[in-house]
Amino acid sequence: MPKTSKRLASLVNKIEERAYEPLEAIKLVKENATAKFDETVEAHARLGIDPKYTDQQLRTTVALPHGTGQTVRIAVITRGEKVAEAKAAGAELAGDEDLVETISKGEMDFDLLIATPDMMPKVAKLGRVLGPRGLMPNPKAGTVTTDLAAAINEFKAGKLEFRADRTGIVHVRFGKASFSEGNLLDNLKTLQETIDRNKPSGAKGRYWKSLYVTSTMGPSVEVDIAALQDINKDG
């Protein structure tokens, strides 16, 4: 443990306490991702919202152009021929009441749960186990749907759901340290645009308080939000 602390301290010393240009911030994160595995790169955005008010909540999805670099394990709660359809589309788990029963026991070997609308009354009873993990299917997030194949393909390709936590901070993984700087920047830009586009109606004052990017084992680097917003993806 002390070895890790010493390593992290030396990396922190490389970073100045200021907001960096987006590409510069990503370069620093990549340089500091020196662990022996391919570290996940994450964004942490502090927003000027208070999610205890319903008109200041943020929950949506983003389709990252270059994916997350992670394998997403998907479970689907449905019935009849839709079970076979979900499995054929690539879902790791699919079932009806049997899967509901398995989940109710706390067995959740998946990262994302999709349900068809007809199964939601049964899924709603799983709120106690699904809610704290952020796994409850939601129509706004695209996880309550009858078009299972399309939803499974989108989430496998890099679409992901995110929400602001109770303190108004959004935590999103947007790639791997092995990604090119350009691909990480594309993904981060897409995330910023999604957060701006879904600004809650009740948000007051300054919407973006801060934005940091980091890798699994590396230090955080602050990003200049205005500079990120000014980037023209088509330019």
Curated annotation (Swiss-Prot):
Keyword Thylakoid carried by entry: no
Molecular functions (GO terms): rRNA binding; structural constituent of ribosome; tRNA binding
Keywords: Repressor, Ribonucleoprotein, Ribosomal protein, RNA-binding, rRNA-binding, Translation regulation, tRNA-binding
Gene3D superfamilies associated with the record: 3.30.190.20, 3.40.50.790
Gene Ontology terms: cellular component: large ribosomal subunit
Taxonomy, superkingdom: Bacteria
GO biological process, one term: regulation of translation
SUPFAM superfamilies in the record: Ribosomal protein L1
InterPro entries named in the record: Ribosom_uL1_bac-type, Ribosomal_uL1, Ribosomal_uL1-like, Ribosomal_uL1/biogenesis, Ribosomal_uL1_3-a/b-sand, Ribosomal_uL1_CS
NCBIfam families given in the database record: rplA_bact
Subunit structure: Part of the 50S ribosomal subunit.
Family as reported in the entry's similarity comment: Belongs to the universal ribosomal protein uL1 family.
Protein name: Large ribosomal subunit protein uL1
Source species: Synechococcus sp. (strain WH7803)
